[in-house]
């Protein structure tokens, strides 16, 4: 005798998270952005493991298709900060590094090292090598003697000893890292790649952000403004916080809840030829002063100036300070 599946005679209770998927996906006319409060509640459920895997995938891809709003990003960030058990540490710059480089070497790492030598306390964080063909910060920490920290205590020690610490996202927000790792399952990057740049988990004096795709920079700036953070958002080379000397740079800033904009003209009269290969030893040689190369010198000095601009120095002063820091750096690695 055949056993047939039981009939559903009573309507199942709706999952509490279903409302948020419905808000985002209810057709062209019915769908809308989440409010800041809804975003905070939704991300809170995700972080508390109260969401089914199918719901999470749908939620992330609907957000990606719609394009997240400043209010959503602010709400998501508030949910994470409310659950983040981070100590109180004195940090000048929050420096997210999630994109990886493919056209040029990561000169921003030398910029960060040079700033740290001069008393600027920098917290860097990243999400690992998620896309093939790119060079990620995590792969170069040992080469450049940048401390890899796996606990907040190690971060505090590294900041006190040398002013620079790198901590992987997986060690302080593992649920977010898991969502980033869905990239090769879902076929697209999720909004978490963008969210990670806004988080500023230690409440640094300024958060630096690089957003490559046009139109997103202002959204990120507005989200940081809603959170009361000081931040500068740029379209950095390859999506990393690194000024491209071959192009104009637009700075999207927010300070004290007020937005500001600044245009920085390109530094090089001619475009540089992209290197045929990314040779890590070239990074070390430039730091040690063994080779003269105009592109990295322009890029890293301008990137230092960007950071100093975020800490309150006007543009001309920031460039002068950056050039002095670079000229007087300790060239040992």
What are these regions (language model features)?
Residues 1-104, 116-118, 122, 269, ...:
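Acidic, glycine/proline-rich low-complexity segments that act as flexible tails and inter-domain linkers
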Residues 59, 141, 196, 304:
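Residue-level signal for inorganic ion chemistry
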Residues 90-157:
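A generic, well-ordered mixed alpha/beta core segment in the N-terminal half of proteins
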Residues 92-94, 120-123, 139, 147, ...:
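Structural motif
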Residues 127-129, 171, 236-238:
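Short, ordered loop/turn segments at secondary-structure junctions
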Residues 150-210:
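Phosphate/diphosphate-binding glycine-rich loops and adjacent basic-rich segments that engage nucleotide
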Residues 186-288, 293-297:
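A structural signal for small-residue-enriched, beta-sheet-centric alpha/beta enzyme cores
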Residues 300-311:
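Short, small-residue alpha-helix embedded
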């Amino acid at each position: 005798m055949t056993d047939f599946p039981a009939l559903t005679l009573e309507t199942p209770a709706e999952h509490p998270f279903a409302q948020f998927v419905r808000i985002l996906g209810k057709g062209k006319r019915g769908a809308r952005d989440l409010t800041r409060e809804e975003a905070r509640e939704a991300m809170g459920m995700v972080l508390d493991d109260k969401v089914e895997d199918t719901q999470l995938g749908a939620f992330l891809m609907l957000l990606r298709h719609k394009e997240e709003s400043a209010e959503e990003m602010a709400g998501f960030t508030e949910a994470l900060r409310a659950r983040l058990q981070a100590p109180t540490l004195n940090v000048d710059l929050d420096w997210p590094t999630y994109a990886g480089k493919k056209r040029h070497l990561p000169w921003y790492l030398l910029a960060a090292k040079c700033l740290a030598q001069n008393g600027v306390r920098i917290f860097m964080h990243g999400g690992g090598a998620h896309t093939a063909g790119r060079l990620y910060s995590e792969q170069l920490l040992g080469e450049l003697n940048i401390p890899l920290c796996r606990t907040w205590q190690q971060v505090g020690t590294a900041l006190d000893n040398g002013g620079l610490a790198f901590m992987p996202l997986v060690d302080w927000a593992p649920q977010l890292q898991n969502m980033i790792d869905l990239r090769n399952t879902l076929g697209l990057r999720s909004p978490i790649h963008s969210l990670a740049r806004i988080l500023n988990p230690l409440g640094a004096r300024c958060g630096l952000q690089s957003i490559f795709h046009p139109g997103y920079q202002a959204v990120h700036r507005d989200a940081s403004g809603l959170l009361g953070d000081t931040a500068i958002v740029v379209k950095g080379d390859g999506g990393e916080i690194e000024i491209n000397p071959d192009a104009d740079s637009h700075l999207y800033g927010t300070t004290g809840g007020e937005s500001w904009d600044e245009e920085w003209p390109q530094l090089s009269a001619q475009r540089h030829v992209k290197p045929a290969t990314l040779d890590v030893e070239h990074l070390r040689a430039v730091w040690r002063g063994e080779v003269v190369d105009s592109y990295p010198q322009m890029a890293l000095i301008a990137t230092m100036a960007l950071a100093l601009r975020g800490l309150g120095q006007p543009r001309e002063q920031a460039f002068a300070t950056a050039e002095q820091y670079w000229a007087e750096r300790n060239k040992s690695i």
